[in-house]
């Protein structure tokens, strides 16, 4: 283990001991905000220090076994103990490296998932609907909550554009690598000659901004228009101007919401999506220079980058960022994304570990 890493782990062990002392004091709950902060830090440090204690025990076992090598009658036993201790230390060190990786501050946030039909006309819109169903089925498996924010349906079904809010533990950390271009290759239902068509959609995954002032939006920078909602909804939907369009003048970002009969609720939803889009824009501008100097395999979130191909005739899905091909497309389209997401997370961790190694 590198000296810098061991020094860091020693510091965390000392800090955990301090937290144990602070949390054992009688008046610890006098300041509830401080108490919550301390318990959260304790919960984060506990597993790391526990793993480090196991690593130190393995190192101690190796040292003890080394001393037995001089005794011929104990040599075989000692060599087995040394080998076992070193294997344990290597495994624990890898786990500790992952635990020490810098955390994405957005990982625990809820998200807005936006899917837009791209090239391919009606077939692209139909595929946007298929992608939405895939993500909704995945969210259902995670027991996350889903709320429709905005939708623009196409004539033959599917969506020209759809935005949903997904709320649940780890929503952003699990879905953040979905941003980018998704290409589909299949025979459309309208194709009479049986020819395979290629079309595409773009997906954007945006962390939800905090309720209180995380993204400052000056009301003077907003243009808010109301209009009559279109599409399904019966006669009532055409009687009032319940649909809302919010334009953020400095950035040109436009959000429309018309899914609710209440103009107030539509405006509230539109402002939430707008805040997330502004936050997302700021994030990508902030990381543009970094991305230019060190091209990351995944996590760039560039909407124009084609990240994945879904080939229906061959029953395969290929993620181009990590060269992963899975021949289980039906299960994937039904929301079974664990293997795919796990591979992306593992690759991302490997990139972070490599960058930390370069820094050392």
Swiss-Prot record:
GO terms for cellular component: cytoplasm. It holds the Pfam family RF-1. Gene3D superfamilies: 3.30.160.20, 3.30.70.1660, 6.10.140.1950. The keyword Transcription regulation does not apply. The modification N5-methylglutamine is found at residue 235. Keywords: Cytoplasm, Methylation, Protein biosynthesis. GO terms for molecular function: translation release factor activity, codon specific. The keyword Protein biosynthesis applies. Belongs to the prokaryotic/mitochondrial release factor family. This is Peptide chain release factor 1.
């Amino acid at each position: 283990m590198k000296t810098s890493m061991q020094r860091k782990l020693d510091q965390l062990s000392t800090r955990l001991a301090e937290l144990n002392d602070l949390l054992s004091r009688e008046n610890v709950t006098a300041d509830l905000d401080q108490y919550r902060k301390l318990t959260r830090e304790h919960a984060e440090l506990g597993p790391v220090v526990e793993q480090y204690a196991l690593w130190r025990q393995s190192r101690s076992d190796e040292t003890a076994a080394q001393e037995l090598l001089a005794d011929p009658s104990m040599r075989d036993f000692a060599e087995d103990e040394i080998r076992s201790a070193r294997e344990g230390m290597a495994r624990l060190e890898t786990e500790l490296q992952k635990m020490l990786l810098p955390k994405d501050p957005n990982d625990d946030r809820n998200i807005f998932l936006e899917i837009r039909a791209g090239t391919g006309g009606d077939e692209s819109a139909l595929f946007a609907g298929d992608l939405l169903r895939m993500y909704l089925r995945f969210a259902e498996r995670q027991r996350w909550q889903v709320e429709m924010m905005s939708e623009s349906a196409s004539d033959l079904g599917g969506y020209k554009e759809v935005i949903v809010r997904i709320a649940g533990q780890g929503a952003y950390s699990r879905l953040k690598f979905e941003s980018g271009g998704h290409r589909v290759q299949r025979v459309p239902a309208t194709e009479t000659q049986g020819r395979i068509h290629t079309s595409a959609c773009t997906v954007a995954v945006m962390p939800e901004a905090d309720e209180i002032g995380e993204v400052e939006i000056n009301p003077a920078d907003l243009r808010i228009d109301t209009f009559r909602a279109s599409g399904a909804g019966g006669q009532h939907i055409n009687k009032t101007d319940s649909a809302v369009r919010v334009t953020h003048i400095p950035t040109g970002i436009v959000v429309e919401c018309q899914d609710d009969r209440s103009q107030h609720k539509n405006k509230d939803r539109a402002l939430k999506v707008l805040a997330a889009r502004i936050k997302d824009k700021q994030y990508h501008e902030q990381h543009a220079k970094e991305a230019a100097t060190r091209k990351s395999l995944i996590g760039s979130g560039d909407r124009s980058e084609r990240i994945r191909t879904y080939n229906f005739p061959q029953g395969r899905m290929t993620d181009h960022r990590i060269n992963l091909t899975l021949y289980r497309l039906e299960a994937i389209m039904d929301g079974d994304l664990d293997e795919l997401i796990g591979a992306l997370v593992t690759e991302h961790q490997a990139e972070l570990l490599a960058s930390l190694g370069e820094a050392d």
